[in-house]
Amino acid sequence: MAEAERIIGTPDIPEAAGAEPEQADGESGGAGAGTERPKGRRRIAVLFAVAALAYAFDLVSKLIVVAKLEHHAPIEIIGDWLRFEAIRNAGAAFGFGEAFTVIFTVIAAAVIVVIARLARKLYSLPWAIALGLLLGGALGNLTDRIFRSPGVFEGAVVDFIAPKHFAVFNLADSAIVCGGILIVLLSFRGLDPDGTVHKD
């Protein structure tokens, strides 16, 4: 009887032994999934922190310019090479396309939506910084287009940084350009927003 029980019970031993590694694998997989989520949240936090800073600097600078500089003589910062001069720009960044204010407003809103959707898969710190700059800059100029005259979605953006022989721009434009340049560099290096690196 004991011999029969031994023969019958023997096949169960490998299965029982095999079940433990599977359980361990499942536990390690769960631990891996748990470590990825905080990483993603940290990158999203960086994205929105950078966007908030860029937006705040742009908003405060425009409020100061409108209150202190508009309808006044330009202020020379570096001789006539760099001045602060308040103007209203109905076009895109650096004064381009003034006849398409509504179109640029829609584009800015679309960029914000795309960045918000992309944030769910954001695991790369450099991409978080780049997209944060884009988001903050887009929000800054979109705020002007919605709330400033002559009307909703047709408002003129406040520009004030006036280098010699160059278009007048603002801090939101600077954030957008810096974010765009960083995205191009990251793309050339093969770094994706989810943190993976690929080589063509």
From Swiss-Prot:
Major location category of this protein: membrane
E.C. number(s) listed in UniProt: 3.4.23.36
Keywords: Aspartyl protease, Cell membrane, Hydrolase, Membrane, Protease, Transmembrane, Transmembrane helix
One GO term (biological process): proteolysis
Span list, region Disordered: 1-37
Entry superkingdom: Bacteria
One Gene Ontology cellular component annotation held by this UniProt entry: plasma membrane
Active-site residues annotated for this sequence: D159, D173
Alphabetized InterPro entries for the sequence: Peptidase_A8
Pathway: Protein modification; lipoprotein biosynthesis (signal peptide cleavage)
Transmembrane regions listed in the UniProt entry: 46-66, 96-116, 122-142, 166-186
Gene Ontology MF terms in the entry: aspartic-type endopeptidase activity
Keyword ATP-binding: no
PROSITE patterns in alphabetical order: SPASE_II
Membrane-related topology note: Multi-pass membrane protein
Subcellular location: Cell membrane
Pfam families: Peptidase_A8
Presence of the UniProt keyword Metal-binding in the record: no
Reaction(s) catalysed by this chain's protein: Release of signal peptides from bacterial membrane prolipoproteins. Hydrolyzes -Xaa-Yaa-Zaa-|-(S,diacylglyceryl)Cys-, in which Xaa is hydrophobic (preferably Leu), and Yaa (Ala or Ser) and Zaa (Gly or Ala) have small, neutral side chains
Protein role: This protein specifically catalyzes the removal of signal peptides from prolipoproteins.
Family: Belongs to the peptidase A8 family.
Name of this chain's protein: Lipoprotein signal peptidase
